[in-house]
């Protein structure tokens, strides 16, 4: 991934965020909430698709229509429940249609055999 940071903009301010500190993005209509590894949350005036494009070819994967996660923060995958637990303890849904692609992403990054 060539991008090392993102400029997150909302109606009040713009903030430069190290992309490695982003745990996940969650869609909120035409806005997006970004959760960082220090547990801070930032609301951005861009939609989830915009962030998906900006983080393509990196460690991010769209696991559900509402969630884009940093796979480096995955600690547990609940196979039969279609859920993923992140290092913060937050459990994120895994779309049935994305499960195989998710495993392939983890494999391609060398995170699993």
Stretches with model-predicted labels:
Residues 52, 103-104:
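A cross-family signal for key residues in well-ordered alpha-helices
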Residues 81-103:
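C-terminal structural segments of small proteins and small subunits
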Residues 1-87:
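Conserved binding/recognition cores within well-folded domains
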Residues 1-4, 105-113:
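Inter-domain helical "communication" segments and dimerization helices
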């Amino acid at each position: 991934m060539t991008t090392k940071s993102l400029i997150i903009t909302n109606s009040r301010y713009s903030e430069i965020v190290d992309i490695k500190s982003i745990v996940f993005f969650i869609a909120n209509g035409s806005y997006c909430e970004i959760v960082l590894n220090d547990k801070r949350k930032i609301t951005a005036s861009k939609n989830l698709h915009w962030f998906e494009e900006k983080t393509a070819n990196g460690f991010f994967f769209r696991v559900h229509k509402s969630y884009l996660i940093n796979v480096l923060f995955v600690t547990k995958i609940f196979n039969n429940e279609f859920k993923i637990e992140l290092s913060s303890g937050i459990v994120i849904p895994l779309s049935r249609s994305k499960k195989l692609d998710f495993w392939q992403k983890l494999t391609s990054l060398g995170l699993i055999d």
